[in-house]
Amino acid sequence: MISDSIPKELILEIMLRLPAKSIARFHCVSKQWASMLSRPYFTELFLTSSSTQPRLLFAIKRNGLWCFFSLPKHQSPYDNSSSSLVVAADFHMKFLPNKIQMYSSSENRKLSCCYASGLTYFYDMYSEVRVICNPITGRYASLPYLKRYRKELSFFGFDPIDKQFKEWLKYAYSLRDDKFFTHDVFVVRVTATEMNTIQRVEIQGFGECQHEYDYYRSRVVYVFADHVEDLDVNDPKLLESKEEEEEEEEEEEEEEEEEEEEEEEEEEEESKEREKEKKIETVIGGWIKQYWACFLRKSWELNPHR
């Protein structure tokens, strides 16, 4: 029960300064606490407060179990005071295989991940399964099937206008995916593009693998940036990466066209060579026929009674 001697506003202010894992545990204190912490008003305040403190969330899948690692505020990767960080798992979660099929033994399996306002979004590009989960509560739900198109990128975001989560099938800005692995210590490297620095983050609980095959097969790392920012899709600066990607696609198309033209030229040259060979064969064949006819005629003239 909330003490009457402590103002409710003060309790909420204290709660806003606590980590999400503590908030999840406090739901079990009492029905009154659970009701207060479950209100949309508190959730919005908590997420707004968290958005002012840039953090990183690492999701690592190992043998079907998802482990979520949250980077504390005082260990921000943008702080140059330390070159190496150590973090432990904050949440563990496992999807029920009889409800959501998201895993396969294929090494070519690709899983797209996004994060928005406390929820994580997983998209299996092979089976086209989309799942939204809350790592704090362990609850998750699958999204209905959506037709996908070639070269599609799927993102998940929060619309602050109507307070609804939406899946974005079109994007305004894309980030580069980089993977760094070691056999001795399991680490993730975070790049601060503005400062041109690289931060080393060590993940506890994932030691050295016995076999290289198990290492690459059972461990996949995904990085989520917990950052909220108003984006103007018409701003050229925000569309630089997309324009660069479009330029790269145009260059690739031009290269493909050049390759096709070269192949066509090679085919034309080969066709001309074949026609030339056929003409030569025809001429040689004609010569052979003439020579053979002349030989038979001479033989007949020399021995007409034969």
From Swiss-Prot:
InterPro entries assigned to the protein according to its UniProt record, in alphabetical order: F-box-like_dom_sf, F-box_dom
PROSITE patterns: FBOX
UniProt-annotated stretches for the region Disordered: 235-278
Residue ranges with Acidic residues bias: 242-270
Domain F-box: 1-45
Top-level taxon in the UniProt lineage: Eukaryota
Stretches of the chain forming a coiled coil according to its record: none
SMART domains the UniProt entry points to: FBOX
Protein name: Putative F-box protein At1g47300
